[in-house]
């Protein structure tokens, strides 16, 4: 979010200072995630369709906005549609999931911009897998499957492109290795704000980790019911080509698998990768993982996810390199994903909050970042 907004503002003639506690931009969850460009299919336990309706606009706008930001075509886009594999312990039964997927497909068809998505989804449809199709890809605990027109891309590759785009903008000053703990209005909320002793016409808080604590210093109280989860996953490069589908084990605390191309993969299992879950305003520092701990996580992902999607075992067996990486994810929701009543099953409470010229952005999902950044840039640089 911060990188996207900085580039949009600089190209509108604004002088921008970009603060980051890390040594370089885009080193956390914005680099290390599955890269799903959401259309809303994942949130089948939100039968109101509110989450899908809030996500779909940003998802459809993602590709053209990102290509505008980087000046390059997007790379390493998963070549196949996502498979949603319904687990026997899913919090949403197969018939209900199928009906939900059909409603989301209709929503996508009704929105403008379907042809601009990672693939043309202007005529979006969800298809139930036959028994033979399901048996060819899934393990015994999977009771149904659906093919939906949702895609993912390799976020590591895109992060590198965004870093290059940031470096090319002369109006952006980089303050790396600088932790922002507080902000202060200088002469009322509608005037300048101070950060690290400097005055700025606008201050935008685009943090994932620590945003609420900084908001509090601005006098912006957090809405109730949030969570900070620190999650890691496996980012895999294989020694040779493997043809594999991208799939999500749904709906609950399971896992997913992305095939960006024939040698670049992502794999996760929720309980293996969830290393912290905090409802504090300031969550704990990210855990430091030893090499042994990372190997254990990789082995558990391979075992748990591989039991439901056997091709995963073949991918792990052919590993040339594997990185266990991730970051903090903020959600305006909480609870256990195996609880149908958990508010974490809804992700429609994200967006922009303001106090004068202090702006706080809850990005919501990776896929909605450029859309929100573009809107905020238009507001600031009119």
Summary of predicted features, one role per range:
Residues 10-32:
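Glycine-rich FAD pyrophosphate-binding loop
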Residues 35-129:
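Dinucleotide-binding Rossmann-like beta1-alpha1 core, especially the glycine-rich loop
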Residues 106-111, 275-333:
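Flavin-binding catalytic cores
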Residues 143-149, 157, 307-382:
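C-terminal catalytic lobe of FAD-dependent flavoproteins
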